[in-house]
Swiss-Prot record:
InterPro entries: AceGlu_kinase-like_sf, Acyl_CoA_acyltransferase, Asp/Glu/Uridylate_kinase, GNAT_dom, NAGS_kin, NH2A_AcTrfase. One of its GO terms (molecular function) is L-glutamate N-acetyltransferase activity. GO terms for cellular component: chloroplast. The keyword Repeat does not apply. Pathway: Amino-acid biosynthesis; L-arginine biosynthesis; N(2)-acetyl-L-ornithine from L-glutamate: step 1/4. It comes from the Eukaryota. Its main location: plastid. This is Probable amino-acid acetyltransferase NAGS1, chloroplastic. Pfam families: AA_kinase, Acetyltransf_1. Residues 1-67 form a transit peptide. It is found in: Plastid, Chloroplast. Belongs to the acetyltransferase family. ArgA subfamily.
Length: 609
Protein backbone atom coordinates (compact mmCIF):
# COMPACT_ATOMS: atom_id res chain seq x y z
CA UNK A 1 0.00 0.00 0.00
CA UNK A 2 1.38 3.43 -0.94
CA UNK A 3 0.93 6.92 0.38
CA UNK A 4 0.01 9.66 -2.13
CA UNK A 5 0.07 12.73 0.13
CA UNK A 6 -3.53 12.10 1.27
CA UNK A 7 -5.40 9.73 3.55
CA UNK A 8 -4.71 6.04 2.92
CA UNK A 9 -7.23 3.56 4.28
CA UNK A 10 -6.86 -0.19 4.78
CA UNK A 11 -9.03 -2.71 6.58
CA UNK A 12 -7.22 -2.16 9.86
CA UNK A 13 -5.63 1.27 9.92
CA UNK A 14 -6.07 4.81 8.72
CA UNK A 15 -2.99 6.95 8.11
CA UNK A 16 -3.13 10.72 8.06
CA UNK A 17 -0.02 12.42 6.63
CA UNK A 18 1.99 14.12 9.34
CA UNK A 19 2.28 17.35 7.34
CA UNK A 20 -1.47 17.91 7.63
CA UNK A 21 -1.93 20.66 10.29
CA UNK A 22 -4.74 18.80 12.05
CA UNK A 23 -2.76 15.57 12.09
CA UNK A 24 0.26 17.38 13.53
CA UNK A 25 -1.91 18.68 16.34
CA UNK A 26 -3.39 15.25 17.07
CA UNK A 27 0.07 13.70 16.98
CA UNK A 28 1.01 15.44 20.23
CA UNK A 29 -1.63 13.40 22.08
CA UNK A 30 -0.55 10.00 20.77
CA UNK A 31 1.40 7.81 23.18
CA UNK A 32 5.12 7.57 22.31
CA UNK A 33 4.86 3.82 21.74
CA UNK A 34 2.32 4.44 19.02
CA UNK A 35 4.38 6.99 17.13
CA UNK A 36 5.35 4.79 14.19
CA UNK A 37 7.57 7.33 12.45
CA UNK A 38 7.79 11.11 12.07
CA UNK A 39 5.86 11.08 8.79
CA UNK A 40 2.55 9.49 9.64
CA UNK A 41 0.13 8.84 12.46
CA UNK A 42 -1.49 5.49 13.09
CA UNK A 43 -5.09 5.81 14.18
CA UNK A 44 -6.78 2.55 15.17
CA UNK A 45 -10.26 1.78 13.81
CA UNK A 46 -12.14 2.74 17.00
CA UNK A 47 -10.82 6.27 16.64
CA UNK A 48 -12.09 6.27 13.03
CA UNK A 49 -15.70 6.67 14.18
CA UNK A 50 -16.79 10.18 15.16
CA UNK A 51 -13.70 11.66 16.78
CA UNK A 52 -14.04 15.43 16.29
CA UNK A 53 -10.32 15.83 15.80
CA UNK A 54 -10.14 13.10 13.20
CA UNK A 55 -13.30 14.30 11.51
CA UNK A 56 -11.73 17.74 11.23
CA UNK A 57 -8.60 16.18 9.84
CA UNK A 58 -10.67 14.27 7.29
CA UNK A 59 -12.60 17.40 6.34
CA UNK A 60 -9.39 19.37 5.95
CA UNK A 61 -7.56 16.70 4.04
CA UNK A 62 -8.31 18.29 0.68
CA UNK A 63 -7.39 21.71 2.01
CA UNK A 64 -4.07 20.19 2.92
CA UNK A 65 -3.85 18.48 -0.42
CA UNK A 66 -4.11 21.81 -2.20
CA UNK A 67 -0.83 22.86 -0.61
CA UNK A 68 1.05 19.72 -1.67
CA UNK A 69 4.04 20.19 -3.93
CA UNK A 70 2.67 18.19 -6.87
CA UNK A 71 -1.03 18.44 -6.19
CA UNK A 72 -1.64 21.70 -8.02
CA UNK A 73 -0.88 19.80 -11.20
CA UNK A 74 -3.15 16.99 -10.03
CA UNK A 75 -6.04 19.41 -9.52
CA UNK A 76 -5.51 20.89 -12.97
CA UNK A 77 -5.43 17.40 -14.47
CA UNK A 78 -8.69 16.42 -12.77
CA UNK A 79 -10.34 19.71 -13.79
CA UNK A 80 -9.22 19.25 -17.39
CA UNK A 81 -10.46 15.67 -17.49
CA UNK A 82 -13.88 16.69 -16.22
CA UNK A 83 -14.10 19.52 -18.74
CA UNK A 84 -13.04 17.18 -21.54
CA UNK A 85 -15.54 14.40 -20.92
CA UNK A 86 -18.34 15.88 -23.09
CA UNK A 87 -15.89 15.98 -25.99
CA UNK A 88 -14.66 12.46 -25.23
CA UNK A 89 -18.25 11.30 -25.43
CA UNK A 90 -19.05 13.33 -28.55
CA UNK A 91 -16.00 12.22 -30.56
CA UNK A 92 -16.24 8.50 -29.78
CA UNK A 93 -16.94 6.42 -32.91
CA UNK A 94 -16.58 9.48 -35.15
CA UNK A 95 -14.53 9.32 -38.35
CA UNK A 96 -11.82 11.92 -38.91
CA UNK A 97 -9.82 12.29 -42.10
CA UNK A 98 -6.47 13.85 -41.19
CA UNK A 99 -3.99 15.24 -43.68
CA UNK A 100 -0.52 16.01 -42.33
CA UNK A 101 1.69 18.31 -44.36
CA UNK A 102 5.11 17.13 -45.43
CA UNK A 103 6.68 20.00 -43.48
CA UNK A 104 5.24 18.65 -40.23
CA UNK A 105 6.20 15.06 -41.06
CA UNK A 106 9.74 16.27 -41.75
CA UNK A 107 9.94 18.30 -38.53
CA UNK A 108 10.46 17.70 -34.81
CA UNK A 109 6.73 17.59 -33.95
CA UNK A 110 5.88 14.59 -36.12
CA UNK A 111 6.35 12.08 -33.28
CA UNK A 112 4.03 14.02 -30.97
CA UNK A 113 1.32 14.39 -33.61
CA UNK A 114 1.33 10.66 -34.32
CA UNK A 115 1.44 9.82 -30.62
CA UNK A 116 -1.68 11.94 -30.08
CA UNK A 117 -3.40 10.23 -33.01
CA UNK A 118 -2.65 6.85 -31.44
CA UNK A 119 -4.06 8.07 -28.14
CA UNK A 120 -7.25 9.33 -29.79
CA UNK A 121 -7.59 6.08 -31.73
CA UNK A 122 -7.64 4.17 -28.45
CA UNK A 123 -10.39 6.53 -27.24
CA UNK A 124 -12.60 5.23 -30.03
CA UNK A 125 -12.03 7.75 -32.84
CA UNK A 126 -11.65 6.32 -36.35
CA UNK A 127 -8.83 7.81 -38.42
CA UNK A 128 -7.96 7.98 -42.09
CA UNK A 129 -4.47 9.50 -42.42
CA UNK A 130 -3.39 11.17 -45.66
CA UNK A 131 0.28 12.21 -45.35
CA UNK A 132 1.76 14.91 -47.55
CA UNK A 133 4.86 14.19 -49.61
CA UNK A 134 5.61 17.43 -51.47
CA UNK A 135 8.56 18.43 -49.26
CA UNK A 136 10.08 14.97 -49.36
CA UNK A 137 9.71 14.63 -53.15
CA UNK A 138 11.35 18.01 -53.73
CA UNK A 139 14.21 17.05 -51.40
CA UNK A 140 14.83 13.80 -53.27
CA UNK A 141 14.79 15.62 -56.61
CA UNK A 142 17.23 18.24 -55.29
CA UNK A 143 19.60 15.49 -54.12
CA UNK A 144 19.55 14.13 -57.68
CA UNK A 145 20.13 17.50 -59.30
CA UNK A 146 16.59 17.87 -60.59
CA UNK A 147 14.20 20.81 -60.25
CA UNK A 148 10.53 20.24 -59.41
CA UNK A 149 8.04 21.59 -61.94
CA UNK A 150 4.59 22.90 -61.01
CA UNK A 151 1.84 24.22 -63.23
CA UNK A 152 -1.03 25.67 -61.26
CA UNK A 153 -2.00 23.42 -58.36
CA UNK A 154 -0.34 20.28 -59.75
CA UNK A 155 3.15 18.86 -60.05
CA UNK A 156 4.33 17.80 -63.49
CA UNK A 157 5.30 14.21 -62.75
CA UNK A 158 8.04 12.98 -65.07
CA UNK A 159 9.80 9.65 -64.55
CA UNK A 160 12.25 11.09 -62.00
CA UNK A 161 9.45 12.77 -60.06
CA UNK A 162 7.38 9.57 -60.06
CA UNK A 163 10.31 7.58 -58.69
CA UNK A 164 10.83 10.20 -55.98
CA UNK A 165 7.10 10.14 -55.19
CA UNK A 166 7.18 6.35 -54.75
CA UNK A 167 10.20 6.55 -52.46
CA UNK A 168 8.75 9.39 -50.40
CA UNK A 169 5.37 7.71 -50.01
CA UNK A 170 6.98 4.41 -49.04
CA UNK A 171 9.34 5.96 -46.50
CA UNK A 172 6.57 8.03 -44.90
CA UNK A 173 4.25 5.02 -44.73
CA UNK A 174 6.90 2.92 -42.98
CA UNK A 175 7.67 5.77 -40.59
CA UNK A 176 4.00 6.30 -39.67
CA UNK A 177 3.45 2.58 -39.15
CA UNK A 178 6.50 2.46 -36.88
CA UNK A 179 5.44 5.49 -34.84
CA UNK A 180 1.94 4.10 -34.30
CA UNK A 181 3.15 0.62 -33.33
CA UNK A 182 4.37 1.15 -29.74
CA UNK A 183 1.87 0.27 -27.04
CA UNK A 184 1.39 2.17 -23.78
CA UNK A 185 3.94 2.19 -20.98
CA UNK A 186 4.53 -1.30 -19.58
CA UNK A 187 4.79 0.24 -16.12
CA UNK A 188 1.29 1.69 -16.42
CA UNK A 189 -0.16 -1.57 -17.74
CA UNK A 190 1.40 -3.51 -14.89
CA UNK A 191 0.00 -1.05 -12.42
CA UNK A 192 -3.53 -0.71 -13.78
CA UNK A 193 -4.05 -3.16 -16.62
CA UNK A 194 -3.90 -6.71 -17.88
CA UNK A 195 -0.32 -8.00 -17.91
CA UNK A 196 -1.21 -10.44 -20.70
CA UNK A 197 -1.35 -7.45 -23.08
CA UNK A 198 2.17 -6.22 -22.36
CA UNK A 199 3.55 -7.05 -25.79
CA UNK A 200 0.63 -6.15 -28.05
CA UNK A 201 1.27 -3.66 -30.84
CA UNK A 202 -0.18 -0.23 -30.31
CA UNK A 203 -2.26 0.59 -33.41
CA UNK A 204 -3.02 -1.60 -36.40
CA UNK A 205 -2.37 0.36 -39.61
CA UNK A 206 -3.88 -0.72 -42.93
CA UNK A 207 -2.70 0.70 -46.23
CA UNK A 208 -3.35 -0.29 -49.83
CA UNK A 209 -5.01 0.69 -53.07
CA UNK A 210 -8.05 2.34 -51.51
CA UNK A 211 -8.78 4.61 -54.48
CA UNK A 212 -8.67 4.48 -58.25
CA UNK A 213 -7.02 7.24 -60.25
CA UNK A 214 -6.78 8.46 -63.82
CA UNK A 215 -4.18 10.53 -65.62
CA UNK A 216 -4.60 14.29 -65.54
CA UNK A 217 -3.34 14.22 -69.10
CA UNK A 218 -2.58 17.25 -71.24
CA UNK A 219 -4.20 20.46 -69.99
CA UNK A 220 -3.75 23.78 -71.84
CA UNK A 221 -0.86 22.27 -73.76
CA UNK A 222 0.95 21.00 -70.65
CA UNK A 223 1.56 17.26 -70.35
CA UNK A 224 1.35 16.44 -66.65
CA UNK A 225 2.90 13.00 -67.16
CA UNK A 226 2.14 10.57 -64.33
CA UNK A 227 0.13 13.10 -62.33
CA UNK A 228 -3.19 11.58 -61.39
CA UNK A 229 -6.69 12.62 -60.44
CA UNK A 230 -8.89 10.77 -57.96
CA UNK A 231 -11.44 8.71 -59.88
CA UNK A 232 -13.15 6.63 -57.20
CA UNK A 233 -12.77 6.05 -53.46
CA UNK A 234 -13.23 2.47 -52.26
CA UNK A 235 -15.67 3.45 -49.53
CA UNK A 236 -16.69 -0.06 -48.49
CA UNK A 237 -13.15 -1.27 -47.91
CA UNK A 238 -12.16 1.84 -45.99
CA UNK A 239 -15.19 1.57 -43.73
CA UNK A 240 -14.56 -2.14 -43.24
CA UNK A 241 -11.00 -1.46 -42.06
CA UNK A 242 -12.10 1.38 -39.80
CA UNK A 243 -14.84 -0.74 -38.25
CA UNK A 244 -12.33 -3.52 -37.59
CA UNK A 245 -10.26 -1.17 -35.44
CA UNK A 246 -7.55 -0.14 -37.89
CA UNK A 247 -6.17 3.25 -38.78
CA UNK A 248 -6.34 3.59 -42.56
CA UNK A 249 -3.24 5.08 -44.16
CA UNK A 250 -4.21 6.57 -47.51
CA UNK A 251 -1.15 7.39 -49.58
CA UNK A 252 -1.33 9.85 -52.44
CA UNK A 253 -0.28 7.20 -54.96
CA UNK A 254 -3.23 6.05 -57.02
CA UNK A 255 -3.57 3.24 -59.51
CA UNK A 256 -5.17 3.49 -62.91
CA UNK A 257 -7.38 0.92 -64.60
CA UNK A 258 -4.37 -0.06 -66.73
CA UNK A 259 -2.13 -0.72 -63.73
CA UNK A 260 -0.17 2.53 -63.75
CA UNK A 261 1.03 4.21 -60.57
CA UNK A 262 -0.01 7.86 -60.54
CA UNK A 263 1.13 10.69 -58.28
CA UNK A 264 -2.00 12.42 -56.93
CA UNK A 265 -2.42 15.65 -55.01
CA UNK A 266 -2.58 14.98 -51.26
CA UNK A 267 -5.40 17.43 -50.59
CA UNK A 268 -7.42 16.12 -53.51
CA UNK A 269 -7.12 12.62 -52.04
CA UNK A 270 -8.00 13.82 -48.52
CA UNK A 271 -10.98 15.94 -49.53
CA UNK A 272 -12.33 13.29 -51.90
CA UNK A 273 -12.05 10.66 -49.17
CA UNK A 274 -13.72 12.87 -46.55
CA UNK A 275 -16.64 13.51 -48.89
CA UNK A 276 -16.99 9.93 -50.06
CA UNK A 277 -16.98 8.24 -46.65
CA UNK A 278 -19.05 10.99 -45.01
CA UNK A 279 -16.37 11.93 -42.49
CA UNK A 280 -17.39 13.82 -39.38
CA UNK A 281 -14.33 16.06 -39.66
CA UNK A 282 -11.49 16.88 -41.98
CA UNK A 283 -8.42 17.91 -39.99
CA UNK A 284 -5.53 19.63 -41.75
CA UNK A 285 -2.28 19.69 -39.76
CA UNK A 286 -0.13 22.39 -41.32
CA UNK A 287 3.18 24.11 -40.61
CA UNK A 288 1.62 27.31 -39.26
CA UNK A 289 -1.57 29.05 -38.08
CA UNK A 290 -4.32 30.87 -39.99
CA UNK A 291 -4.01 34.54 -39.03
CA UNK A 292 -6.05 37.62 -39.87
CA UNK A 293 -4.62 40.88 -41.18
CA UNK A 294 -3.74 41.93 -37.61
CA UNK A 295 -1.77 38.78 -36.92
CA UNK A 296 -4.45 37.25 -34.68
CA UNK A 297 -5.44 33.62 -34.87
CA UNK A 298 -8.73 33.12 -36.71
CA UNK A 299 -10.49 30.66 -34.42
CA UNK A 300 -13.83 30.19 -36.12
CA UNK A 301 -15.43 30.75 -39.51
CA UNK A 302 -18.86 29.84 -40.72
CA UNK A 303 -18.98 28.30 -44.17
CA UNK A 304 -20.39 31.55 -45.50
CA UNK A 305 -17.51 33.56 -44.01
CA UNK A 306 -14.87 31.19 -45.38
CA UNK A 307 -16.53 31.27 -48.80
CA UNK A 308 -16.57 35.07 -48.75
CA UNK A 309 -12.89 35.34 -47.80
CA UNK A 310 -11.82 32.95 -50.55
CA UNK A 311 -13.96 34.67 -53.19
CA UNK A 312 -12.58 38.09 -52.29
CA UNK A 313 -9.12 36.83 -53.24
CA UNK A 314 -10.09 35.11 -56.48
CA UNK A 315 -8.42 37.88 -58.52
CA UNK A 316 -5.05 37.46 -56.81
CA UNK A 317 -5.04 33.72 -56.10
CA UNK A 318 -5.25 30.95 -58.69
CA UNK A 319 -6.37 28.48 -56.04
CA UNK A 320 -9.16 30.84 -54.93
CA UNK A 321 -10.17 31.30 -58.56
CA UNK A 322 -10.29 27.53 -59.00
CA UNK A 323 -12.49 27.28 -55.91
CA UNK A 324 -14.97 29.76 -57.40
CA UNK A 325 -14.89 27.86 -60.68
CA UNK A 326 -15.47 24.55 -58.89
CA UNK A 327 -18.39 25.63 -56.72
CA UNK A 328 -19.96 28.15 -59.07
CA UNK A 329 -20.27 31.91 -59.17
CA UNK A 330 -23.80 32.10 -57.81
CA UNK A 331 -23.33 30.06 -54.65
CA UNK A 332 -22.69 32.99 -52.37
CA UNK A 333 -26.04 34.67 -53.01
CA UNK A 334 -27.87 31.75 -51.48
CA UNK A 335 -26.23 32.27 -48.11
CA UNK A 336 -27.61 34.46 -45.34
CA UNK A 337 -25.74 37.67 -44.66
CA UNK A 338 -22.49 37.19 -42.71
CA UNK A 339 -22.95 36.29 -39.08
CA UNK A 340 -19.66 38.06 -38.63
CA UNK A 341 -18.74 37.88 -35.03
CA UNK A 342 -21.57 40.08 -33.93
CA UNK A 343 -24.73 38.10 -34.30
CA UNK A 344 -26.26 41.13 -36.06
CA UNK A 345 -27.36 39.11 -39.06
CA UNK A 346 -29.44 40.86 -41.68
CA UNK A 347 -31.10 38.32 -43.92
CA UNK A 348 -32.58 39.16 -47.33
CA UNK A 349 -36.34 38.78 -47.46
CA UNK A 350 -36.04 36.12 -50.14
CA UNK A 351 -33.54 34.01 -48.18
CA UNK A 352 -34.54 30.39 -47.91
CA UNK A 353 -33.33 29.44 -44.48
CA UNK A 354 -32.83 25.71 -44.69
CA UNK A 355 -29.50 24.27 -43.50
CA UNK A 356 -26.54 25.25 -45.62
CA UNK A 357 -25.40 21.66 -45.94
CA UNK A 358 -28.85 20.56 -47.13
CA UNK A 359 -28.95 23.24 -49.78
CA UNK A 360 -25.39 23.00 -51.05
CA UNK A 361 -24.49 19.33 -50.76
CA UNK A 362 -26.01 17.18 -53.48
CA UNK A 363 -25.65 13.46 -52.91
CA UNK A 364 -22.09 12.34 -53.54
CA UNK A 365 -22.10 9.86 -56.40
CA UNK A 366 -18.72 8.20 -55.98
CA UNK A 367 -16.86 7.95 -59.26
CA UNK A 368 -18.90 10.42 -61.29
CA UNK A 369 -18.73 13.59 -59.22
CA UNK A 370 -21.76 15.04 -57.54
CA UNK A 371 -25.31 14.50 -58.74
CA UNK A 372 -24.33 11.98 -61.43
CA UNK A 373 -21.88 14.37 -62.99
CA UNK A 374 -24.33 17.25 -63.26
CA UNK A 375 -23.75 18.81 -59.86
CA UNK A 376 -21.48 21.53 -58.61
CA UNK A 377 -18.30 19.49 -58.81
CA UNK A 378 -18.88 17.18 -61.75
CA UNK A 379 -15.24 17.39 -62.83
CA UNK A 380 -13.51 16.69 -59.53
CA UNK A 381 -13.78 14.18 -56.71
CA UNK A 382 -11.79 16.39 -54.36
CA UNK A 383 -10.13 19.79 -54.30
CA UNK A 384 -6.43 20.01 -55.10
CA UNK A 385 -4.18 22.66 -53.60
CA UNK A 386 -0.47 23.05 -54.17
CA UNK A 387 2.04 24.47 -56.59
CA UNK A 388 4.16 27.57 -56.28
CA UNK A 389 1.37 29.63 -54.72
CA UNK A 390 1.05 27.29 -51.75
CA UNK A 391 4.79 26.77 -51.37
CA UNK A 392 5.52 30.52 -51.38
CA UNK A 393 2.70 31.28 -48.90
CA UNK A 394 2.11 34.60 -50.65
CA UNK A 395 -1.54 34.25 -49.65
CA UNK A 396 -0.92 32.63 -46.29
CA UNK A 397 -3.06 29.54 -45.80
CA UNK A 398 -5.77 30.65 -48.21
CA UNK A 399 -5.37 27.42 -50.17
CA UNK A 400 -6.18 25.28 -47.12
CA UNK A 401 -9.11 27.57 -46.35
CA UNK A 402 -10.42 27.03 -49.87
CA UNK A 403 -10.19 23.26 -49.41
CA UNK A 404 -12.03 23.59 -46.09
CA UNK A 405 -14.86 25.57 -47.68
CA UNK A 406 -15.05 23.05 -50.53
CA UNK A 407 -15.58 20.01 -48.31
CA UNK A 408 -17.97 21.90 -46.03
CA UNK A 409 -20.12 22.66 -49.05
CA UNK A 410 -19.94 19.00 -49.96
CA UNK A 411 -21.32 17.79 -46.64
CA UNK A 412 -18.45 17.56 -44.13
CA UNK A 413 -19.76 19.74 -41.32
CA UNK A 414 -16.47 20.64 -39.60
CA UNK A 415 -12.95 21.30 -40.88
CA UNK A 416 -10.07 22.14 -38.54
CA UNK A 417 -6.90 23.90 -39.73
CA UNK A 418 -4.20 23.31 -37.11
CA UNK A 419 -0.65 24.52 -36.58
CA UNK A 420 1.32 21.30 -36.27
CA UNK A 421 4.28 23.10 -34.68
CA UNK A 422 2.29 23.51 -31.45
CA UNK A 423 2.82 20.56 -29.15
CA UNK A 424 -0.47 18.76 -28.49
CA UNK A 425 -2.42 20.93 -30.93
CA UNK A 426 -4.73 18.06 -31.89
CA UNK A 427 -5.73 17.40 -28.28
CA UNK A 428 -6.10 21.09 -27.53
CA UNK A 429 -8.35 21.61 -30.55
CA UNK A 430 -10.60 18.64 -29.86
CA UNK A 431 -10.91 18.90 -26.08
CA UNK A 432 -10.59 22.60 -25.24
CA UNK A 433 -13.65 24.79 -25.48
CA UNK A 434 -11.89 27.47 -27.55
CA UNK A 435 -9.67 25.05 -29.43
CA UNK A 436 -6.20 25.89 -30.67
CA UNK A 437 -6.72 26.26 -34.40
CA UNK A 438 -9.21 27.47 -36.99
CA UNK A 439 -12.55 25.71 -37.36
CA UNK A 440 -14.72 26.10 -40.45
CA UNK A 441 -18.26 24.86 -39.84
CA UNK A 442 -21.31 24.52 -42.05
CA UNK A 443 -23.78 23.67 -39.28
CA UNK A 444 -23.10 26.25 -36.57
CA UNK A 445 -25.56 29.15 -36.33
CA UNK A 446 -27.42 27.92 -39.39
CA UNK A 447 -30.19 30.42 -40.02
CA UNK A 448 -29.54 32.33 -36.76
CA UNK A 449 -30.13 36.06 -36.89
CA UNK A 450 -31.47 38.98 -34.93
CA UNK A 451 -35.26 39.26 -34.93
CA UNK A 452 -37.04 41.79 -37.14
CA UNK A 453 -40.51 43.31 -36.95
CA UNK A 454 -41.80 40.95 -39.62
CA UNK A 455 -40.80 38.02 -37.38
CA UNK A 456 -43.36 38.89 -34.69
CA UNK A 457 -46.00 36.55 -36.07
CA UNK A 458 -43.54 33.68 -36.30
CA UNK A 459 -42.27 34.23 -32.76
CA UNK A 460 -45.81 34.46 -31.45
CA UNK A 461 -46.72 31.19 -33.15
CA UNK A 462 -43.82 29.37 -31.48
CA UNK A 463 -44.21 30.72 -27.95
CA UNK A 464 -48.02 30.69 -27.80
CA UNK A 465 -48.37 26.96 -26.91
CA UNK A 466 -45.74 27.36 -24.20
CA UNK A 467 -47.49 30.42 -22.80
CA UNK A 468 -50.78 28.55 -22.73
CA UNK A 469 -49.18 25.64 -20.87
CA UNK A 470 -47.60 27.98 -18.34
CA UNK A 471 -44.02 27.14 -19.33
CA UNK A 472 -43.43 30.73 -20.50
CA UNK A 473 -44.66 34.04 -19.15
CA UNK A 474 -47.41 35.56 -21.29
CA UNK A 475 -46.37 38.60 -23.28
CA UNK A 476 -48.71 40.97 -25.07
CA UNK A 477 -47.92 41.97 -28.63
CA UNK A 478 -46.80 45.36 -27.33
CA UNK A 479 -44.43 43.76 -24.81
CA UNK A 480 -43.08 41.43 -27.45
CA UNK A 481 -42.49 44.32 -29.83
CA UNK A 482 -40.62 46.32 -27.16
CA UNK A 483 -38.39 43.32 -26.43
CA UNK A 484 -37.83 42.44 -30.08
CA UNK A 485 -34.28 43.82 -30.18
CA UNK A 486 -33.30 41.23 -27.58
CA UNK A 487 -34.62 38.27 -29.57
CA UNK A 488 -32.68 35.90 -31.80
CA UNK A 489 -34.50 33.63 -34.25
CA UNK A 490 -33.71 30.63 -36.43
CA UNK A 491 -35.25 30.77 -39.89
CA UNK A 492 -35.74 27.81 -42.21
CA UNK A 493 -37.63 27.74 -45.50
CA UNK A 494 -38.85 31.26 -44.78
CA UNK A 495 -40.37 30.24 -41.44
CA UNK A 496 -39.25 30.97 -37.89
CA UNK A 497 -38.55 27.61 -36.23
CA UNK A 498 -36.94 28.73 -32.95
CA UNK A 499 -36.34 31.83 -30.85
CA UNK A 500 -34.61 33.01 -27.69
CA UNK A 501 -33.95 36.30 -25.93
CA UNK A 502 -31.04 37.85 -24.04
CA UNK A 503 -31.76 40.78 -21.70
CA UNK A 504 -28.46 42.28 -20.50
CA UNK A 505 -27.89 43.93 -17.11
CA UNK A 506 -24.62 45.70 -17.77
CA UNK A 507 -24.10 47.14 -14.31
CA UNK A 508 -24.19 43.66 -12.76
CA UNK A 509 -22.34 42.16 -15.78
CA UNK A 510 -24.99 39.51 -16.25
CA UNK A 511 -27.86 38.76 -18.58
CA UNK A 512 -31.19 36.98 -18.49
CA UNK A 513 -31.89 34.13 -20.89
CA UNK A 514 -35.59 33.98 -21.69
CA UNK A 515 -38.18 32.61 -24.09
CA UNK A 516 -36.12 29.75 -25.53
CA UNK A 517 -38.65 27.98 -27.72
CA UNK A 518 -38.48 25.59 -30.67
CA UNK A 519 -41.30 24.70 -33.04
CA UNK A 520 -42.80 21.33 -32.14
CA UNK A 521 -41.88 19.71 -35.47
CA UNK A 522 -38.25 20.85 -35.17
CA UNK A 523 -37.50 19.62 -31.66
CA UNK A 524 -34.80 17.06 -31.11
CA UNK A 525 -32.57 18.59 -33.80
CA UNK A 526 -30.31 20.58 -31.48
CA UNK A 527 -31.87 23.96 -32.27
CA UNK A 528 -32.19 24.83 -28.57
CA UNK A 529 -28.52 24.09 -27.98
CA UNK A 530 -27.49 26.21 -30.96
CA UNK A 531 -29.57 29.12 -29.70
CA UNK A 532 -28.19 28.84 -26.16
CA UNK A 533 -24.63 28.65 -27.46
CA UNK A 534 -25.29 31.68 -29.65
CA UNK A 535 -26.73 33.58 -26.67
CA UNK A 536 -23.72 32.67 -24.52
CA UNK A 537 -21.26 33.87 -27.15
CA UNK A 538 -23.20 37.08 -27.65
CA UNK A 539 -23.31 37.68 -23.88
CA UNK A 540 -19.57 37.10 -23.64
CA UNK A 541 -18.98 39.54 -26.50
CA UNK A 542 -21.07 42.12 -24.62
CA UNK A 543 -18.76 41.80 -21.63
CA UNK A 544 -21.24 39.88 -19.48
CA UNK A 545 -19.86 37.35 -17.02
CA UNK A 546 -22.99 35.51 -15.86
CA UNK A 547 -26.28 34.33 -17.28
CA UNK A 548 -29.39 33.71 -15.22
CA UNK A 549 -32.89 32.49 -15.92
CA UNK A 550 -36.25 31.79 -14.31
CA UNK A 551 -37.96 28.50 -15.08
CA UNK A 552 -40.83 26.37 -13.85
CA UNK A 553 -40.65 23.37 -16.19
CA UNK A 554 -37.24 23.07 -17.86
CA UNK A 555 -34.74 23.07 -15.00
CA UNK A 556 -33.24 19.71 -15.98
CA UNK A 557 -32.48 20.91 -19.51
CA UNK A 558 -30.55 23.91 -18.23
CA UNK A 559 -28.75 21.98 -15.48
CA UNK A 560 -27.35 19.65 -18.12
CA UNK A 561 -25.98 22.72 -19.87
CA UNK A 562 -24.06 24.09 -16.91
CA UNK A 563 -26.64 26.15 -15.00
CA UNK A 564 -26.87 25.82 -11.21
CA UNK A 565 -29.75 26.70 -8.93
CA UNK A 566 -29.24 29.95 -7.05
CA UNK A 567 -31.14 32.05 -4.47
CA UNK A 568 -33.30 34.93 -5.63
CA UNK A 569 -30.84 37.36 -4.04
CA UNK A 570 -28.38 36.65 -6.84
CA UNK A 571 -30.81 37.99 -9.44
CA UNK A 572 -30.22 41.68 -10.26
CA UNK A 573 -32.42 43.93 -8.15
CA UNK A 574 -34.00 45.58 -11.18
CA UNK A 575 -35.16 42.16 -12.31
CA UNK A 576 -36.21 40.94 -8.86
CA UNK A 577 -38.69 43.78 -8.58
CA UNK A 578 -40.54 42.47 -11.63
CA UNK A 579 -40.65 38.77 -10.67
CA UNK A 580 -44.11 37.28 -10.35
CA UNK A 581 -43.61 35.31 -7.14
CA UNK A 582 -46.90 33.48 -7.60
CA UNK A 583 -45.32 31.46 -10.44
CA UNK A 584 -42.88 29.99 -7.88
CA UNK A 585 -40.13 29.94 -10.48
CA UNK A 586 -36.74 28.39 -9.83
CA UNK A 587 -33.66 30.55 -10.37
CA UNK A 588 -30.57 29.31 -12.16
CA UNK A 589 -27.25 30.92 -12.98
CA UNK A 590 -24.21 30.07 -15.08
CA UNK A 591 -20.76 31.64 -15.11
CA UNK A 592 -19.53 32.38 -18.61
CA UNK A 593 -16.03 31.39 -19.59
CA UNK A 594 -14.13 33.93 -21.69
CA UNK A 595 -14.93 32.89 -25.24
CA UNK A 596 -12.34 33.95 -27.77
CA UNK A 597 -14.13 32.15 -30.56
CA UNK A 598 -17.35 34.05 -30.10
CA UNK A 599 -19.11 36.87 -31.83
CA UNK A 600 -18.36 40.56 -31.68
CA UNK A 601 -20.95 43.23 -31.16
CA UNK A 602 -19.22 45.42 -33.71
CA UNK A 603 -21.16 45.37 -36.97
CA UNK A 604 -18.13 44.60 -39.11
CA UNK A 605 -16.64 41.42 -40.43
CA UNK A 606 -13.66 40.95 -38.15
CA UNK A 607 -12.00 38.45 -35.88
CA UNK A 608 -11.07 38.90 -32.27
CA UNK A 609 -8.03 37.36 -30.70
Amino acid sequence: MTERGAMVVSSSTCYVPFRCPQARKDFAFVEPSKKLNPNRVLIKPPVYTYSPALTAAKCNIFDYAETGENLVGDKQFVRWFREAWPYLWAHRSCTFVVTISGDVLDGPYCDLVLKDIAFLHHLGIKFVLVPGTQVQIDQLLAERGREPTYVGRYRVTDSASLQAAKEAAGAISVMIEAKLSPGPSIYNIRRHGDSSRLHETGVRVDTGNFFAAKRRGVVDGVDFGATGLVKKIDVDRIRERLDSGSVVLLRNLGHSSTGEVLNCNTYEVATACALAIGADKLICIMDGPVLDENGHLVRFLTLQEADTLVRKRAQQSEIAANYVKAVGDGGISSFPEPLGYNGMVTTPNNHIGRPIWEKLSPTFQNGVGFDNGNGLWSGEQGFAIGGEERISRLNGYLSELAAAAFVCRGGVKRVHLLDGTISGVLLLELFKRDGMGTMVASDVYEGNREAKVEDLAGIRQIIKPLEESGALVRRTDEELLRALDSFVVVEREGHIIACAALFPFFEEKCGEVAAIAVASDCRGQGQGDKLLDYIEKKASALGLEMLFLLTTRTADWFVRRGFQECPIEMIPEARRERINLSRRSKYYMKKLLPDRSGISVVRTFQYDS
